Swiss-Prot record:
Functional summary from the UniProt entry: Reversibly transfers an adenylyl group from ATP to 4'-phosphopantetheine, yielding dephospho-CoA (dPCoA) and pyrophosphate.
Keywords tagged on the record: ATP-binding, Coenzyme A biosynthesis, Cytoplasm, Magnesium, Nucleotide-binding, Nucleotidyltransferase, Transferase
Family affiliation: Belongs to the bacterial CoaD family.
Positions bound to substrate: 9, 41, 73, 87
Protein name (Swiss-Prot/TrEMBL): Phosphopantetheine adenylyltransferase
Recorded superkingdom: Bacteria
Taxonomic lineage of the native organism: Bacteria, Bacillati, Bacillota, Clostridia, Eubacteriales
UniProt GO molecular function: ATP binding; pantetheine-phosphate adenylyltransferase activity
């Protein structure tokens, strides 16, 4: 069984993330979207909220699960008995960083492969940071995030 892990902070999940999730889920038996608990970041959404948003976005998918993790990614991948890490790339600048991480992961866990997936051209500019900045200032985020969570993102800034 091919088990893939797609890690990220997903703060919030965007249509770019969803594009990678949908495409990756078609080439594996099971895809775990792994939401990183990163103590050094100050996320807009709590880990519970990010997991909940992702579950809402992938509702109805039969081979996708959402989990959170902390610590080393390779340890989580081993724990899940997965064999591939999926990484989405938007631009050359993403590749430089992700290549270094893939090589480090390979050093730590030689049996785990990293598969790079280019973002669809429609989302090659998109990041969670950009979505948050737009939403913070009342910009239009429709088409950038899954429609089913758009209101929750906008409402998050109304509470601040």
């Amino acid at each position: 069984m091919n088990k893939f892990i797609y890690p990220g902070s997903f703060d919030p999940v965007t249509n770019g993330h969803l594009d990678i999730i949908e495409r990756a889920s078609k080439i594996c038996d099971k895809l775990t979207v792994a939401v990183l608990i990163n103590q050094s970041k100050n996320p807009l959404f709590s880990i519970e909220e990010r997991v909940s948003l992702l579950k809402k976005v992938v509702k109805g998918s039969t081979n996708i699960e959402i989990e959170c993790f902390s610590g080393l990614l390779v340890d989580f991948v081993k724990e899940k008995n997965a064999n591939v890490i999926i990484k989405g790339l938007r631009a050359v600048s993403d590749f430089e960083y992700e290549l270094q991480m893939a090589l480090l992961n390979k050093n730590q866990a030689p049996d785990i492969e990293t598969l790079f997936m280019m973002s669809s051209i429609n989302y090659s500019f998109l990041s969670s940071s950009m979505v948050k900045e737009l939403a913070r200032h009342g910009g239009n985020i429709s088409g950038l995030v899954p429609e089913c969570i758009e209101k929750e993102i906008i409402d998050k800034f109304k509470l601040k």
